[in-house]
Amino acid sequence: LITTPEQQADFESQADDGWAYYDELDGFVLYKNKNYVPMGFTYDYYVTEETYGQVNKNSRANLLMRALVFSDEDAAVYGKYLAELPNEKQSELTYDAYVQDCANRRAQACSMFQMNNAGFHAEITLENANLVFFSVPYDDGFTAYVNGEQTDIVRVDDGMMAVLCPAGTSSIDFVYQADGLALSRTGTLAALPVWLVYTAYFVWRKRKKSKV
């Protein structure tokens, strides 16, 4: 996260323990998120969009680190690969639990993620078949391939993407082409780093508001 020296004191007074001072560069103060999770990971649990909508808005960011959000239709198809989140785990959304959920996601993350001119490439090794989640906005211009074979892209988490991968090591490729609109593709790919920073800031702002 990047802030200015003038805002540094305010940030440090409001931020949780997950943020640590990192460096200063060109008049900006840099902070490292110790709860960072790499791109591309799996979950053990899922919830439906209806259940997600019933959770307090200030806790939803925490829930998204614990469970994948399915539509009812996708839950019927892909729910067999995960367990539905028990009721008691839907309310245990404390900061300490969030830290543990981040650690769990890191332990189930891709061993490789790389952007390229066509989209992005990732690799992951799974003990069992599961959905691999990417915090990239869903777009009809994406086509996904798992081990060289085209596969369905599942719209999850209110607009992000996931693909089903088998047990073992899988090679995942997302290729973007929106009706030949190269500029659109470039803009979407260039936005990925910005999206990651925004997501981290969004979580921090949510926590800040909840403390007021």
For the regions a protein language model found, what residue spans apply to each?
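Active-site-proximal, structured, solvent-exposed surfaces of multi-pass membrane proteins
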Residues: A83-V212
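Extracytoplasmic
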Residues: L1-R105, E127, P137, N147
